[in-house]
């Protein structure tokens, strides 16, 4: 299973959506929504970038989440996306302190 396929399935389950509901909410045709989402989750087909963007909106995750290889990186992307602008600045400052000159 590809990283993209795995992340789509994880985010869908986390959101509590069926494959059909996710496909419909992302703008797929009613007759093929479930089948297409199933194929994406199995890694048999790769969704176009514009569909990945729509999935990210429906599932409330950043599009980059779908391409994160490591699970902790994927989780970090979700958490970072939920921060406000000021919180992001604070986090980046703290990360710079922690990393120093690494």
Predicted features and spans:
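Interfacial/linker helices and their anchor residues that mediate assembly or domain coupling
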Residues: 70-102
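A short, Lys/Arg-rich alpha-helix, primarily the initiator
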Residues: 1-14
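DNA major-groove recognition helix of helix-turn-helix/homeodomain DNA-binding modules
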Residues: 44, 48-65
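DNA major-groove recognition helix of helix-turn-helix
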Residues: 26, 41, 51, 67-70
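Short alpha-helical DNA-recognition segment
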Residues: 16-39, 54
């Amino acid at each position: 299973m590809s990283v993209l396929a795995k992340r789509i399935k994880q985010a869908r389950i986390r959101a509590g959506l069926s494959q059909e509901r996710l496909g419909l909410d992302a703008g797929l045709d009613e007759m093929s929504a479930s089948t297409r989402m199933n194929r994406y989750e199995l890694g048999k087909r790769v969704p176009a970038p514009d569909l990945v963007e729509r999935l990210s909106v429906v599932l409330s995750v950043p599009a980059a989440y779908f391409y994160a290889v490591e699970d902790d990186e994927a989780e970090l992307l979700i958490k970072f996306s939920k921060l406000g602008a000021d919180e992001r600045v604070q986090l980046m400052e703290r990360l710079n302190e922690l990393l120093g000159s690494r």
